[in-house]
Every structure is written in structure tokens, then in C-alpha cells.
Amino acid sequence: NASQCLVIEDSFTGFCAAQSAGIATIVIAEDSQHARFQAAAGRYQTLPELLEALSAEPAAAV
């Protein structure tokens, strides 16, 4: 079930494949902020940047 999956991708081709399959995608690439990745669930330039975001404490619920 695509709604229960997450792809972490480092190429535009892989990003397109995941998007075509209806799978949420996080992009890790130097050009991740490029407009072609705007539909990504997350965009990071490096793996450490993603790992830092994942380890951050979530904001308190209001």
C-alpha cells in the first residue's frame, strides 16, 4: 500500500518513479531545493541534515 510507504531518494529519476507510484518521497540531493522537487515530502541537501531533522523534538501541540 503506497500510503504506508516512504521513499528516500537522491536522484530526480528515482523521485519521479516514487511520485508516479504515489509514494511520499524525501529528497536528499545538493539541488534538493530546485523547483523540480517541490512535490517532495521533505528536501535536504545531506543525510546528516535529514538525520538532524528526524532527531529534533516535535513542536508542542497547541
Regions found by a protein language model. Give the residues of each.
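Asp-based, Mg2+/Mn2+-dependent phosphohydrolase catalytic module
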Residues: 1-62
